[in-house]
């Protein structure tokens, strides 16, 4: 896919799962959605990061997460689209609420 986010936007591949998950530190995340076609639309794997500042800002964002990390973001943020059967979303940096590193053994791309 040749989509590159601009400014402080983040391109994510949506994670599909309809179950509660428990992190290694015991945090329970319920990812079920009322609309099963868009389940877990608030969790995704980072595919690409925008390289510039948002409109009206002079500093580039300092991302604490990178390509390959899993992020959680506001439910109604950004735009959703499909490409070759996969679901993606482009969201603003300020809509990212939390992130986690991939499980050990899975390498993160930079």
Swiss-Prot record:
Its main location: cytoplasm. The keyword Cell inner membrane does not apply. GO terms for cellular component: cytoplasm. It is found in: Cytoplasm. GO terms for biological process: chaperone cofactor-dependent protein refolding. SUPFAM superfamilies: GroES-like (SSF50129). SMART domains: Cpn10. The keyword Chaperone applies. It comes from the Bacteria. GO terms for molecular function: ATP binding; metal ion binding; protein folding chaperone; protein-folding chaperone binding; unfolded protein binding. It holds the Pfam family Cpn10. Keywords: Chaperone, Cytoplasm. Belongs to the GroES chaperonin family. Heptamer of 7 subunits arranged in a ring. Interacts with the chaperonin GroEL. Together with the chaperonin GroEL, plays an essential role in assisting protein folding. The GroEL-GroES system forms a nano-cage that allows encapsulation of the non-native substrate proteins and provides a physical environment optimized to promote and accelerate protein folding. GroES binds to the apical surface of the GroEL ring, thereby capping the opening of the GroEL channel. NCBIfam families: PRK00364.3-2. This is Co-chaperonin GroES.
């Amino acid at each position: 896919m040749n989509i590159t986010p601009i400014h402080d936007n983040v391109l994510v591949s949506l994670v599909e799962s309809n179950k509660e998950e428990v992190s290694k530190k015991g945090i329970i995340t319920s990812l079920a959605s009322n609309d099963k076609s868009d389940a877990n639309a608030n969790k995704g794997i980072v595919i690409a990061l925008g390289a510039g500042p948002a409109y009206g800002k002079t500093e580039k964002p300092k991302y604490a997460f990178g390509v390959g990390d899993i992020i959680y973001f506001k439910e109604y943020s950004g735009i959703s689209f499909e490409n070759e059967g996969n679901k993606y979303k482009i969201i603003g940096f300020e809509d990212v609420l939390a992130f986690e590193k991939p499980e050990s053994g899975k390498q993160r791309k930079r």
